[in-house]
Amino acid sequence: MSDFKRRKLEGGKSAIDAARERKALKKASAPLKKSHAKPAPSNKPTAKRPPPPSPPQSQSEEDEDEFGGFSGEEEEDVSRAKMTNGSTAKADAEAEQSDEEAEAQAAAAVEAPKKTFADLGVREELCDACENLGYKTATPIQTESIPLALAGKDIIGLAETGSGKTAAFVLPILQALLDKPQAYFGLIMAPTRELAYQISQQVDALGSIINVKCATLVGGMDMVPQAIALSKRPHIIVASPGRLLDHLENTKGFSLKHLKYLVLDEADRLLDLDFGDSLDKIFKVLPRDDRHTYLFSATMSSKVESLQRAALKNPVRVSISSSSHQVVSTLLQSYMLIPHKYKDLYLIHLLNDNIGHATILFTRTVNETQRLAVLLRTLGFQALPLHGQLSQSNRLGALNKFKAKARDILVATDVAARGLDIPSVDLVVNFDLPHDSETYVHRVGRTARAGKSGKAVSFVTQYDLEIFQRIEHALGKQVPEEKVSRDEVMVYAERVGEAQRVAVREMKDLHDQRKSGRGGRGGGRGGGRGGRGRGGRRDNMDMDEG
């Protein structure tokens, strides 16, 4: 291994140890609390891996040291360092967790038995619809918010991702609609097209027994079919703010002056995406009196507080998640410490250990999303890309194929990290770490939803150490490391190398097509915000898409 590369990897090693030492020294003077924390469960994958391809015929010892990141002596040094710091780090971790465990045990002791939807006051027809969808008992956010909604209260709902909040606001609207059927009865606003379509599907499913009509209004789609759907006077409208405003201003005969229910879903995200001006204009044409409003959000920022004051009347706050960085207890988190240049090899090893499991891979850029999708398809994996520069039809097609299990790997930017209810995701892989801990929580929240178990694995390279330390700090605990033998990973080097060359050629063709204005497989006609990069502008394929 070259001195430069060795220094880089050694720097990575010392950075982790130094961070842990600083943390241990900082807390050494404070008395430690007693703890009965149980050891973390093993993160070793249990799925059997098919026979790997034959290893390369020739492999130098220098290449092996370079690949693995540490020589044998270095590995012993790392082990000794971890053992030296291990007792202190373990004690610190136990001290940190003791209060949390005590609170969790206290909460469990007083937790009431799970309630059915009938217990919450939901009518029999809608209970039957819930039963048909496999909803046996209500989730905590449903248990807390549905009775309040049925009592006519405005609600602010703060809940962790995957908590079942969509049904929490759809069921009360449908129940009120049964008592007083009316066109344009309810309006649900969502920040993204995908989330809007997902909510519409939930409305259709829960309202199928009572023949509810729902229209979906989102950008990137032809306005004419949407106007036709509005002319049929649907009971419920699910919309993104921008496209809803377009129809309010341009579609003849469409008015919401008799609206009874308004829902702002993912309100923090609505404001993050600069929908504030559109929302102000929409609120001006909505009735203020005789309207019930529900606001659901992952966080309660100052912007959301302002939105609450503008849209709600004497709301009741329902908070299920005590922290914006809380993850569900059924989620098993781990990380792999790997050299940056071998991320593809580690990924293939991980996916082979999870053959047949529904998996979402998260990347930072559109370019990397496309490259990984090509790489995986070349190696025989059923992978689809999902990012903001795909046309709307391609994005919906990718989501529907993944939901229907026609494809088992979705390679996505953070366009898919919030709000999407994709059932039965077994594994989330942070191929690229997100820039902040909140995005991390939303990403890993795609699995272990509604009480199911799931796993999230993060790739941490020598360039990601500081970011990962910040994520761990926000989570309030250390994420356990998942170790992989370099020999197990190295057997994929030859085949992965060939697939990488294929991906490079395809990506070059794609970029050439974009420069010539012909679009291409990655872009579609809908493109993304910011266009095609004409006039020497940076290609949007290389930009972060958070």
Curated annotation (Swiss-Prot):
InterPro entries: DDX47/Rrp3_DEADc, DEAD/DEAH_box_helicase_dom, DEAD_box_RNA_helicase, Helicase_ATP-bd, Helicase_C-like, P-loop_NTPase, RNA-helicase_DEAD-box_CS, RNA_helicase_DEAD_Q_motif. The keyword Kinase does not apply. A motif (DEAD box) lies at residues 265-268. Residues 519-530 have a biased composition (Gly residues). Residues 1-108, 504-546 are annotated as: Disordered. The keyword Cell inner membrane does not apply. Residues 342-490 form the Helicase C-terminal domain. Keywords: ATP-binding, Helicase, Hydrolase, Nucleotide-binding, Nucleus, Ribosome biogenesis, RNA-binding, rRNA processing. Residues 504-515, 536-546 have a biased composition (Basic and acidic residues). ATP binds at A159, E160, T161, G162, S163, G164, K165, T166. Residues 146-318 form the Helicase ATP-binding domain. It comes from the Eukaryota. It is found in: Nucleus. ATP-dependent rRNA helicase required for pre-ribosomal RNA processing. Involved in the maturation of the 35S-pre-rRNA and to its cleavage to mature 18S rRNA. Interacts with the SSU processome. Belongs to the DEAD box helicase family. DDX47/RRP3 subfamily. This is ATP-dependent rRNA helicase RRP3.
